[in-house]
Structure formats: C-alpha cells, structure tokens
C-alpha cells in the first residue's frame, strides 16, 4: 500500500530510516544540553515537551523541509498548508500516557455519523525518532483505523475510555524513522525503561483554511525558510521569543 492510501486507511504511515544519522545525532546533542526534568509534560510526568532549535545554526532542515514528507503532505492538503507546531517529545516516563486523540473530528459526531465519514485529515503530525526506538525506550503506540471511529467516549482532554481501545501497534523503528499520522488517530506515549531520554520530534501541519492563532518564532531564519515547501504566514523569522 502506498503511503497516502495507508494514511487514509490506517490513520498513519511509516517511512523507515528517512532522516540521516548525522541530523539525528546533532539534534540529540542540542536537546541533551537543554533538557531538564522541570519541562512541561503531557498527561503523565516524564512525557516532556522540549523546544527545538529556533536559530539558524542548529535548525534541523533535513527534518522540517524533507522532500519525501512534503510530497505526501502536499498531495493530501494542497500547496498552501502551514506548520503550526514545532516541538519535541522528551520521554523519561515511568508510566504510560492514556490513549488519546490530539484533536477531535471537525464536525459534531452525530453529523459525521449521518454523513458516513469524518472526511480526510485537516491536520497532520509528523513524528521523527532521533534514536532506535522500541518497547524498551518508549515507542509510540497507535490504534490503527481509529481516526474514522465515531462510536467512543472521551473527556475534554481527548482521553479515550479504555473499553473502546482494540488492536494496537507499537511503532518500533530505527533511528531517523518518520511516522506521519492523521491528528485524530488514537495513540499514547509509553514507558521508557532505559536511563537515556528518548526524543521524538513533532511537527504539525494544517490545511490553509483552518487557521490557528499561535505563531512560531525563530531568529535570523529568513534565508533558512526562503522557498520552504509550505506557507510561512504564521512564522516570525527574526524573533526568538518563546
């Protein structure tokens, strides 16, 4: 199955070993220098979020501008999609996250049921492993086909009740592998049993018509983003404030 068909059907697709070891290692060194256990976390302590480089010297161009990734995104979302999220998961967790969805369906669930489908993705997340990742150090756990499920209950934070979780898949993959997922697909972060932080880059992309208010800030990056493969309307390229 080709990547786009798999993303539509399964809710995610995988591109193994897409990003070079050099890029992964350089970014890991940057993140190690900036990691601390007081960082914010999602759902469960240890599932931290850490800032990615905002200055041109350390900016991971191979990840953010990767041609293969953006060929897929452009075919799904057209030429005017934009990057609304630029962050990294730093996992030292001793507990799993709850299964959750990062966003709900665009229309009310009753409307989606009557229509027969929630429609194609309007937001897509691209995750990149910076190291070999498996059950020992917190591989992402996905619920295949869950992005089209409309018969479930969740709380206001997107947690899915356990009784609705069926078959799952652990994304056990080598360094530099990329997971492209419909933002509605259910998933969770898992325990990292090792004593080294597991990093997973997360860049989020949205259809042009679904405009979010948050702006991404960079410093001295005009040349870096010149002719980038997505719309830069929401990027402040000479402002490194967080």
Predicted regions span which residues?
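Non-heme Fe(II)-dependent double-stranded beta-helix
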Residues: 1-9, 15-117
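Hydrophobic beta-strand signal
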Residues: 14, 179-180, 202
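Short, solvent-exposed loop/turn segments at secondary-structure junctions
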Residues: 20-21, 88-93, 104, 133-135, ...
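C-terminal/domain-terminus segments
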Residues: 44-47, 142-155, 193-204
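Catalytic core of non-heme Fe(II) oxygenases with the double-stranded beta-helix
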Residues: 95-172, 211-216
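Conserved metal-binding segment of the jelly-roll/cupin
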Residues: 173-187
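Non-heme Fe(II)/2-oxoglutarate
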Residues: 185-242
């Amino acid at each position: 199955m080709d990547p786009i068909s798999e993303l539509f059907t399964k809710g995610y697709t995988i591109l193994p070993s897409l990003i070079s070891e050099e890029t992964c290692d350089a970014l890991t060194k940057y993140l190690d220098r900036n990691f601390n256990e007081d960082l914010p976390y999602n759902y469960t302590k240890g599932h931290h979020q850490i800032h990615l480089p905002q200055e041109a010297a350390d900016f991971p161009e191979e990840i953010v501008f990767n041609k293969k990734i953006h060929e897929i995104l452009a075919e799904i979302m057209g030429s005017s999609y934009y990057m609304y999220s630029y962050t990294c998961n730093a996992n030292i967790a001793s507990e799993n996250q709850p299964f959750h969805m990062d966003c709900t369906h665009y229309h009310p669930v009753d409307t989606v049921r009557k229509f027969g489908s929630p429609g194609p993705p309007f937001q897509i997340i691209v995750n990149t492993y910076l190291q070999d990742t498996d059950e020992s150090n917190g591989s992402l756990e996905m619920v295949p086909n869950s992005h089209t499920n409309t018969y479930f209950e969740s709380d206001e934070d997107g947690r899915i009740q356990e009784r609705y979780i069926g078959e799952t898949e652990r994304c056990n993959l080598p360094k530099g592998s990329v997971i492209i997922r419909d933002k509605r697909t259910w998933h969770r972060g898992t325990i990292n049993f090792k004593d080294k932080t597991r990093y997973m880059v997360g860049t989020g992309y949205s259809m042009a018509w679904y405009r979010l208010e948050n702006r991404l800030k960079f410093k001295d990056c005009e040349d870096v983003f010149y002719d980038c493969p997505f719309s830069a309307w929401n990027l402040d390229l000479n402002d490194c404030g967080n």
